């Protein structure tokens, strides 16, 4: 069960989301084209020689829930993180035909082996929380919430409650 992802994604965590929201509120230009984009909730560690990136595991997605519906309504197509999402986020995923993927928590050192490029594109002063453009190649993910609202957190609980 699961999928692999091959495309460009953008990292963004709490502090970067706050700044992105501020840019939206002020009518400023976002650091990347949000329409069709994928955001990976991660704050990679420093890069070792010969590697594109350091450890890069997912951050708890719920911390970005206050921002997710707005970004989804602006065209964000996918989010990657770990953990459940609030009902408002699930509704926005369905409304916009988006998807939420879960990455494997605690496996950041393995995840970095599936990232071939990394470039800081915004908020460099935030360090590991800066916005980075990453290129994923065979990055392992699980579809957690699909475009029609299928939700593994709900179906999983229901399935095991029946056992």
What is each residue range found by the language model?
Residues 6-7, 43, 144:
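Residue-level recognition of conserved beta-strand edge/terminus positions
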Residues 10-139:
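Feature captures the catalytic cores and cofactor-binding loops of soluble hydro-lyases/lyases
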């Amino acid at each position: 069960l699961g999928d692999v992802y091959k495309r460009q994604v953008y990292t963004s965590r709490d502090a970067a989301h706050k700044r992105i929201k501020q840019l939206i509120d002020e009518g400023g230009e976002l650091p990347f084209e949000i329409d069709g984009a994928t955001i990976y909730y991660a704050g990679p560690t420093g890069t070792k020689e010969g590697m594109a990136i350091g450890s890069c595991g997912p951050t708890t997605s719920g911390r970005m829930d206050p921002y997710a519906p707005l970004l989804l309504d602006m065209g964000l197509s996918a989010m990657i993180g770990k953990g459940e999402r609030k009902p408002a986020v699930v509704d926005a995923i369905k409304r916009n035909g988006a998807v939420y993927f879960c990455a494997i928590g605690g496996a950041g050192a393995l995840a970095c082996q599936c990232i071939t490029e990394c470039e800081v594109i915004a908020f460099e002063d935030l360090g590991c929380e800066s916005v980075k453009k990453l290129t994923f190649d065979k990055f392992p993910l699980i579809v957690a919430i699909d475009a029609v609202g299928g939700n593994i957190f709900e179906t999983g609980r229901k399935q095991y409650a029946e056992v």
